[in-house]
From Swiss-Prot:
UniProt comment concerning the protein's domains: An N-terminal amphipathic helix, the BAR domain and a second amphipathic helix inserted into helix 1 of the BAR domain (N-BAR domain) induce membrane curvature and bind curved membranes.
Regions annotated as coiled coil: 156-185
Subunit structure: Homodimer, and heterodimer with SH3GLB2. Binds BAX; induction of apoptosis augments BAX binding. Binds DNM1, HTT, AMPH, BIN1 and ARFGAP1. Interacts with UVRAG; UVRAG bridges the interaction to BECN1 indicative for an association with the PI3K complex II (PI3KC3-C2).
Organism: Rattus norvegicus (Rat)
Record function comment: May be required for normal outer mitochondrial membrane dynamics. Required for coatomer-mediated retrograde transport in certain cells. May recruit other proteins to membranes with high curvature. May promote membrane fusion. Involved in activation of caspase-dependent apoptosis by promoting BAX/BAK1 activation. Involved in caspase-independent apoptosis during nutrition starvation and involved in the regulation of autophagy. Activates lipid kinase activity of PIK3C3 during autophagy probably by associating with the PI3K complex II (PI3KC3-C2).
Limits of the BAR domain: 27-261
Protein name in UniProt: Endophilin-B1
Positions of modified residues (Phosphothreonine): 145
Tissues where this protein is expressed: Expressed in brain, heart, lung and spleen. Low level in liver and testis.
Cell compartments where the protein resides: Cytoplasm; Golgi apparatus membrane; Mitochondrion outer membrane; Cytoplasmic vesicle, Autophagosome membrane
């Protein structure tokens, strides 16, 4: 027998087996043939494996979306991964925002309150960006990779053996059908022999599949450890971000902030929440409005007729002819006037004079 004859016979045998399985499967669907049912334990294991696969895929994909919301970036990373190449490093959103803030602060002037605050905010955003990058790397290594290994490795093996078990089951039921239809003694003997062989192969494949499926419990235990690692990575990330923002808030405590709810303003002048070396902790918020009490240096000025030099913290446009417009960083002369509202001083610049809000000023020694 030459190799070609052997290949032809093998091809014919394979075709016959495939046809036999197709016929058996079709007859089962039509209710014209009996089907060997798997034992309940094996069915439960198969169901558990399928459930694990479905939810692992969903969790894995949504975690990827959480860590990298940009779909184009995810596709790029996927392509590089398939090419077994490292994806080029890309700046993330917090880092980009931080760089914009730093550039803006530098252009506005690091010596100005707003420029200095922008630079500090930008540096914090870049630190958050670094923490974000570390979270992605740690989560990908300790959480996503094990999940992906299960989907692309263990479960593929399970699916392959499950498919093989299905084929062995079809072979077994086809052999049972042929035995039932056999009439001649010789045909019956041959069919019985075939049935014993297919039964043995089916039992063997069922055992192999069962052993693989029982490993799902170990998979769950492993994924639980990976989940703990992911939670720890998130905890570290959020703790870092909280600390960064806490430090930033403390640094910005010496800068003016123009935020006051429009609904709570009692005059046309915006009132900053805190001022460097001027308001400090004496600014307290109450329900419905922001109450500011003067620190000692301003109180002394109001209680006397003396004049002081003051540096303007940021620009102010006069609302009417009784007020004096201000430019950030300019130095003016200020003094109190009896009967004037406690939030205002009289400002003087050359021959110009008018009311100025005290919250826009830093008194100089």
């Amino acid at each position: 027998m030459n190799i070609m004859d052997f290949n032809v016979k093998k091809l014919a045998a394979d075709a016959g087996t495939f046809l036999s399985r197709a016929v058996q499967f079709t007859e089962e669907k039509l209710g014209q043939a009996e089907k060997t049912e798997l034992d309940a334990h094996l069915e439960n294991l198969l169901s558990k494996a399928e459930c694990t696969k479905v939810w692992t895929e969903k969790i894995m994909k949504q975690t990827e979306v959480l860590l990298q919301p940009n779909p184009n970036a995810r596709i790029e990373e996927f392509v590089y991964e398939k090419l077994d190449r490292k994806a080029p490093s890309r700046i993330n959103n917090p880092e980009l925002l931080g760089q914009y803030m730093i550039d803006a602060g530098t252009e506005f002037g690091p010596g100005t309150a707003y420029g200095n605050a922008l630079i500090k905010c930008g540096e914090t955003q870049k630190r958050i960006g670094t923490a974000d990058r570390e979270l992605i790397q740690t989560s990908a290594l300790n959480f996503l990779t094990p999940l992906r290994n299960f989907i692309e490795g263990d479960y593929k093996t399970i699916a392959k053996e499950r498919k093989l078990l299905q084929n062995k089951r079809l072979d077994l039921d086809a052999a049972k059908t042929r035995l039932k239809k056999a009439k001649a003694a010789e045909t019956k003997s041959s069919s019985e022999q075939e049935l014993r062989i297919t039964q043995s192969e089916f039992d063997r494949q069922a055992e192999i599949t069962r052993l693989l499926l029982e490993g799902i419990s170990s998979t769950h235990a492993h994924h639980l450890r990976c989940l703990n690692d992911f939670v720890e990575a998130q905890m570290t990330y959020y703790a870092q971000c909280y600390q960064y923002m806490l430090d930033l808030q403390k640094q910005l405590g010496s800068f003016p902030s123009n935020y006051v709810s429009n609904n709570n303003q009692t005059s046309g002048t915006p009132v900053p929440y805190t001022l460097s070396n001027t308001i400090g902790p004496s600014a307290v918020a109450s329900t419905g409005s922001l109450v500011i009490t003067c620190p000692p240096n301003l109180s002394d000025l109001k209680d006397s007729s003396s004049t002081r030099k003051a540096r303007v913290l940021y620009d102010y446009d006069a609302a009417n002819s009784t007020e004096l417009s201000l430019l950030a960083d300019e130095v003016i002369t200020v003094f109190s006037v009896v009967g004037m509202d406690s939030d205002w001083l009289m400002g003087e610049r050359g021959n110009q004079k008018g009311k100025v809000p005290i919250t826009y000023l830093e008194l100089l020694n």
